[in-house]
Regions:
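Bacterial N-terminal signal peptides that target proteins for export
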Residues: 2-9
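Bacterial N-terminal signal peptides
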Residues: 10-18
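Compact, glycine-rich, soluble single-domain proteins
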Residues: 23-153
Length: 153
């Protein structure tokens, strides 16, 4: 019962956030659609973000390349057509990120924290996933996100 009420409250705030927030990065705003997401952490807290959606192959190849500042409570959600092991890199990405690998049910599968800017090192999901969420470095520690937590959109 408490968990159900917690989820309803989180969804209410997600709706409120989506209706009120606007992002300042015109370039990303023009190239990507936006959506609000809510992260429900195991510590019973809800965190709200507005993310750009990388849905097409070209958008996924571009990602957050050349972005020099990621505003607080923003990020990018990569949406793939199917679940499989995914590989990411940081080529031409000037800021360190936390990468969250998410399965088809919205459950956090694994997290790669504090990625190295502009690195060509491959960062792979540990299991088949359908989504990757990129947030500013340190965000996952700040919201106490762990494997098994749930992300809603």
């Amino acid at each position: 019962m408490i968990r159900k009420n917690h989820s309803l409250i989180c969804l209410f705030f997600l709706t409120l956030l989506y209706s009120c927030i606007s992002l300042g990065s015109d370039e990303l705003d023009n190239a990507f659609k936006q959506r609000s997401i809510m992260i429900s952490s195991s510590n019973q807290s809800c965190s709200h973000f507005v993310v750009w959606l990388a849905e097409t192959r070209n958008q996924q190849m571009r990602g957050l390349m050349y972005v020099k500042n990621l505003p607080q409570n923003t990020g990018m959600l990569f949406i793939y057509p199917d679940s499989k092991i995914r590989a990411m890199w940081m080529k031409n990405t000037y800021i360190s990120l936390d990468m969250i690998f998410i399965d088809e049910n919205g459950i956090v599968s694994s997290i790669e924290k504090n990625t190295e800017p502009q690195s060509l090192k491959t960062i792979r999901s540990e299991k088949p996933i359908k989504y990757v969420l990129e947030l500013a470095e340190g965000t996952t520690d700040q919201i106490k996100l762990i494997e098994g937590d749930h992300i809603y959109w």
